[in-house]
Amino acid sequence: MSLSEARFHDLVDETQEKLEDIFDDSDLDIDMENSAGVLTVKFENGTQLIFSRQEPLRQLWLAAVSGGFHFDYDEESERWMCDKSEEQLGEMLERIVKQQAGTEFDFEGL
């Protein structure tokens, strides 16, 4: 069953808020901007992550140095799952952020 538009937006908003909290709680100098539903995270080394919502597809998209990734929400596991690798968003972010920022983050629950 497909997500309703309202549920989709609620889930993306909740996910972006969790991401902001995780990055805010770090000791790193990270700049974040959330504008029109797009969350941009800029690391000290100039690399960035961009999280955007694709409403028609009901997907959360992630742009990173290593590429672009599309996530569908899995109601059963209550997690965003990559539509290609089936990796959970949190697991993928732990790997990507370590590659880009050179530090480890805990994205448990995403």
Swiss-Prot record:
UniProt cross-references to Gene3D superfamilies, sorted A to Z: Frataxin/CyaY
Origin superkingdom: Bacteria
GO cellular component, one term: cytosol
PROSITE patterns hit by this protein: FRATAXIN_1 (PS01344), FRATAXIN_2 (PS50810)
Residues spanning the membrane: none
Gene Ontology BP, a term: iron-sulfur cluster assembly
Keywords, sorted A to Z: Iron, Metal-binding
GO MF assignments: ferric iron binding; ferrous iron binding
InterPro entries: CyaY (IPR047584), Frataxin/CyaY (IPR002908), Frataxin/CyaY_sf (IPR036524), Frataxin_CS (IPR020895)
Pfam families named in the record: Frataxin_Cyay
Known role: Involved in iron-sulfur (Fe-S) cluster assembly. May act as a regulator of Fe-S biogenesis.
Family per similarity comment: Belongs to the frataxin family.
Name the UniProt record assigns to this protein: Iron-sulfur cluster assembly protein CyaY
Organism annotation: Pseudomonas fluorescens (strain Pf0-1)
Taxonomic placement: Bacteria, Pseudomonadati, Pseudomonadota, Gammaproteobacteria, Pseudomonadales
Gene name as annotated: cyaY
